[in-house]
A protein has these predicted regions:
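Short acidic low-complexity segments
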Residues: 77-95
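Interdomain hinge/lid region at the active-site interface
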Residues: 231-305
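N-terminal hydrophobic or amphipathic helices and topogenic motifs
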Residues: 1-46, 67-70, 77
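Rossmann-fold NAD(P) dinucleotide-binding segment
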Residues: 91-141
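NAD(P)-binding Rossmann-fold cofactor-contacting core
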Residues: 59, 66-83
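Hydrophobic/small residue at the entry helix of a nucleotide-binding pocket
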Residues: 56
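Rossmann-fold dinucleotide-binding core
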Residues: 130-191, 195, 201-204
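Active-site-proximal catalytic alpha-helix in oxidoreductases
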Residues: 165, 178-179, 184, 200-226, ...
């Protein structure tokens, strides 16, 4: 309706739609943030965020503070405004209701294992993008009798509105810890999904690993195109521009984190092998003039993507 009204007034329909979507998102963001704050789940309770100077650690600290938690950030990088601070979490008494491990993946397992030795009374969970590298630390916490689960917010630190976003919770056998972690996001509009540890990393190998690898290959091919590079900067197409927008965002992300996501996942090689096989098949079909294979690949992809969209539409009803 907005597009039709705009067109009747001589205004760009695309501009009108974009403006209306921005207004709706702004309104939903305000409503969601007000609901999170009003429920006050953290009133009279405390939380420790280990690695709270990192981007997602900072987001988590702010998210908990908005719910009324008294938040302490532990990070050797320096203090964070508006939060209590300790440089080293080991100096804390760990008498917190919630302990969040938001360190880089490569050191998170060691932190979890050390926490197991301290046996904190509160709920402990990490927010890492991968779970198989943390398996032993999580198991040590369980064996020590700690309340532990694992969480993966499927969005970046600049996210304000959680509507349409997913938060994954790993069921480690502690129903109380799982319920408490889910309750933290219960007042948001995020989709909350529970799954097993290995299932998570198998899926993440494709959801993150494959999409990252595809975009890294895309912008690497462009960057190494030689004299074509400056000419490409002056050309565009709908498909190229859309892919370039995604690749540009990927290129600005933390390369160390992206390498961890590729290299530390026990199931990561599956998606890379699948990508390599698909590219090799595509190349062979073109080089050998095999139109049937090329067409079959596109038809298979079209069918898969239509079925995926139908499943998403059904799930959102």
């Amino acid at each position: 309706q907005a597009r039709r009204d705009a067109e009747a007034l001589g205004v760009s329909p695309a501009l009108a739609e974009s403006l209306l979507q921005s207004l709706i998102r702004g309104s939903l963001t305000t409503q969601e943030q007000a609901r999170v704050a009003s429920q006050g789940r953290g009133s009279g309770r405390s939380a420790l965020v280990i690695g709270g100077r990192g981007k997602m650690g900072h987001w988590m600290a702010d998210f908990l503070a908005a719910q009324g938690f008294a938040v302490t950030v532990a990070d050797p990088s320096g203090e964070v405004a508006a939060d209590d601070y300790v440089a080293d979490w080991k100096s804390s008494d760990l008498h917190h209701d919630i302990i969040v491990v938001a360190t880089p993946i490569r050191i998170a397992n060691a932190v979890l294992a050390e926490l197991a030795g301290r046996r904190p009374r509160g709920i402990v969970f990490d927010i890492g993008s991968l779970k198989t590298p943390l398996r032993s630390g999580l198991e040590q916490l369980r064996a020590a009798g700690c309340h532990v689960t694992s969480v993966h917010p499927m969005f970046g630190p600049d996210t304000e509105l959680l509507s349409g976003r997913h938060v994954i919770f790993i069921d480690l056998g502690d129903a109380a810890a799982l319920a408490e972690a889910r309750a933290l996001f219960g007042s948001t509009m995020a989709d909350l999904v529970v799954m097993g540890l290995d299932e998570h990393d198998r899926l993440i190998a494709f959801v993150l690993g494959l999409s990252h690898a595809l975009n890294i290959a895309f912008f690497t091919a462009l960057a190494e195109s030689g004299e074509a590079a400056p000419r490409l900067a002056r050309m565009s197409s709908t498909t190229f521009d859309a892919q370039l927008d995604v690749a540009t965002r990927v290129a600005t992300e933390n390369p160390d984190l992206y390498f961890e996501i590729q290299s530390l996942n026990d199931y990561g090689v599956e998606s890379l092998n699948a990508l390599q096989a698909a590219v090799n098949r595509l190349c062979r079909s073109v080089q050998e003039g095999d139109a049937a294979t090329f067409v079959a690949m596109m038809q298979q992809g079209n069918e898969y993507l239509r079925e995926r969209q139908a499943a998403r539409d059904e799930a959102s009803r």
